[in-house]
């Protein structure tokens, strides 16, 4: 196993560890009839009364003055037992449907229809607040963080599978990272089944894979000399490489979105070790991927230089420069694509979350 493969295996282990931690934390802390993990966007009762006094016969100046005075008291924070929470009829719920929160964020609160009874106990309305929006942060972790971490892990595993298939059958630059075609899993299971059940040695698929090895060597030499030209002449190979690249960057972007736990409204109620673990996970994954990319690029450059020396001994410098420039160009395109995806995810994260997770 090469160094790059070891680093990617470590990235998989880190992703699995982070996912297990999130599932454990949600399962351990999900307690019914508990408001400690909920965040409420509230407005004081006096401000809400001012908003209710807006009438059609008021002047524009008066309406703006009342709206400006009533907009200030809106606050977002955890459940405060010194306050009386009254759920507004049009209060919105974040991250999960209402039926999953009835036993948690709605506990120890009153409905707007109970306002008359509440005002009898608290006639001054000083400690009464109206809930405009609320979120169950355990549901946030489960319906967003866990799903995102699972999707990132699955996409990264799919990338590793596609990458292994390419190194086994498709073009590659680093000759040290190629996989023998005879190690194809179908060849192994076919040979094993023939020996166990039919008591014979099945070698046809193995011979066919040896022929593929010869063809693959020719493809590798063409790919090493002119990478961009090879992709232009073989659009299917370009499509498969694009799928591999998309899976890779999509998994990295999905993994990086776990940092939202430090910036979303739920960050005020989630414990510090959850937020610190998210930073540690993203930093470790980023370090592993950077080291893996540097090592992989170094190997590809060395392999391309060796291939150019074998095939074109009279034009080594030109071949090496062409390969290095093509690789740098591809890396720049990959980096630009990643930056655009991250910017788009940050700008339209709410729409993306609504469409993907519901």
From Swiss-Prot:
GO terms for cellular component: host cell endosome membrane; host cell Golgi membrane; host cell plasma membrane; membrane. Residues 1-33 form the signal peptide. GO terms for biological process: fusion of viral membrane with host outer nuclear membrane; symbiont-mediated induction of syncytium formation. It is a multi-pass membrane protein. It comes from the Viruses. It holds the Pfam family Fusion_gly_K. Residues 34-141, 257-273, 345-358 are extracellular. Glycans are attached at residues 57, 80. It is found in: Host cell membrane; Host endosome membrane; Host Golgi apparatus membrane. Belongs to the alphaherpesvirinae glycoprotein K family. Glycoprotein that probably modulates membrane fusion events during secondary envelopment of cytoplasmic capsids that bud into specific trans-Golgi network (TGN)-derived membranes. Also plays a role, together with gB, in virus-induced cell-to-cell fusion (syncytia formation). Seems to block fusion of virions with infected-cell membranes. This is Envelope glycoprotein K. The lineage of its organism: Viruses, Duplodnaviria, Heunggongvirae, Peploviricota, Herviviricetes.
């Amino acid at each position: 196993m090469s160094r790059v493969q070891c680093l990617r295996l470590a990235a998989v282990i880190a992703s699995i560890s982070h996912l297990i931690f999130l599932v454990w934390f949600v399962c351990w802390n999900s307690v019914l009839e508990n408001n400690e993990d909920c965040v409420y966007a509230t407005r004081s009762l006096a401000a809400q009364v001012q908003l209710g006094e807006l009438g059609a016969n008021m002047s524009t100046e008066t309406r703006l003055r009342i709206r400006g005075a009533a907009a200030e008291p809106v606050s977002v924070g955890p459940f405060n037992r010194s306050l009386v929470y009254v759920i507004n009829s049009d209060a919105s719920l974040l991250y999960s449907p209402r039926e999953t929160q009835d036993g948690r964020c709605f506990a120890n609160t009153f409905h707007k229809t109970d306002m008359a009874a509440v005002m009898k106990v608290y006639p001054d309305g000083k400690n009464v607040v109206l809930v405009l929006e609320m979120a169950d942060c355990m549901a946030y972790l489960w319906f967003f963080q866990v799903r995102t971490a699972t999707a990132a892990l699955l996409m990264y595993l799919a990338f590793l599978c596609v990458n292994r298939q390419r190194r086994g059958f498709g073009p590659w630059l680093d000759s040290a990272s190629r996989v023998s075609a005879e190690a194809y899993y179908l060849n192994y299971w076919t040979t094993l089944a023939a020996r166990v059940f039919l008591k014979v040695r099945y070698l046809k698929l193995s011979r066919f894979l040896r022929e593929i090895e010869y063809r693959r060597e020719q493809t590798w030499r063409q790919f090493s000399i002119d990478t961009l030209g090879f992709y232009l002449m073989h659009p299917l190979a370009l499509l498969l490489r694009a799928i591999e690249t998309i899976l890779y960057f999509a998994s990295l972007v999905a993994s990086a979105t776990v940092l939202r736990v430090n910036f979303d409204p739920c960050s005020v109620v989630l414990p510090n070790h959850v937020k610190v673990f998210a930073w540690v996970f993203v930093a470790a994954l980023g370090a592993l991927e950077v080291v893996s990319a540097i090592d992989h690029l170094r190997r590809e450059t060395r392999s391309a230089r060796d291939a150019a020396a074998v095939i074109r001994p009279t034009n080594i410098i030109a071949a090496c420069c062409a390969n290095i420039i093509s690789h740098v160009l591809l890396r720049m395109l990959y980096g630009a694509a990643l930056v655009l995806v991250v910017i788009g995810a940050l700008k339209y994260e709410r729409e993306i979350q609504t469409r993907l997770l519901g």
